[in-house]
Amino acid sequence: ILFIATTILTAQHKAPTDWELSGLKGKVKSQRSIPYEVVTQGKTFVKGAIDRDLDTVVKIGNLDNLQKDFNPNGYLTQMRFFFKNDELYSRMEYYYNPQGQLFETRYNSDKTLYVYNPEGYLIKDATYSPGGFLKTHYNYQVDTNGKVLKEETYHANQLESTIAYTYNKQGDPVEMRYYDAQGNLLQRVESKFNKQHLAERNRTYDKDNKLVNITTKKYNSQGDCIKLQAENKLPQKQKNVATYEYKYDNQGNWIAKTTFINGEPRQIIERTLSYYE
């Protein structure tokens, strides 16, 4: 499921807020994001029409065209995705127990339930169809500090894949190993983090330990990515560089983001944020 709440690899009962996960400063009440095409005019460019949907045939909206709503504690209550014409594409709703733990999400007609161990760490989530049929579920093996050591993905109660995590002393996931249902290694990802716990480099290896891809990131002082370089080694060498320029509001949240691919402007995303007083 695309929009299940992001798996938290740190202590669940001290999970970061969705403000933090979204890189937002201040008490954000709502965030409305709209992507726009870029129109070049000689050596300059301007904002064009709202960017196209991902697929107009099977009707899949642009996932950058969305609104996030937060409760006063910084946790998501709703995410809505829109088509180019502003019609609703899909909706994700979040529900919390009195302790503040996420216990249920609803994506369109599907329902996902979340299970915690006595220490308050997430150990399972399961998604059901409207008729109550179990579609997928995830099992999380955690250590005494709540860090996810192993994540198992099941489809209709059949194991599909497993991810094993290794952490550094700072608690960052520095290695992820991906396995199929039979336990065969599919790929391995090594990650390097900065002092702000933001990923600076990912190196992806295939099952034969051959380097497939290197992705590097650079950030500005606000913690927003300003450069992403993806260098493919296999099956053929290829390198692409994305750079980003931002405009910020008084809270330090970006309200406009321009994306360049290999130096060419590709997209402008504008965000409107409202805040709790």
Give the label of every model feature segment.
Residues 1-15:
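Bacterial Sec-dependent N-terminal signal peptides
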Residues 12-277:
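Buried hydrophobic residues that stabilize the cores of well-folded domains
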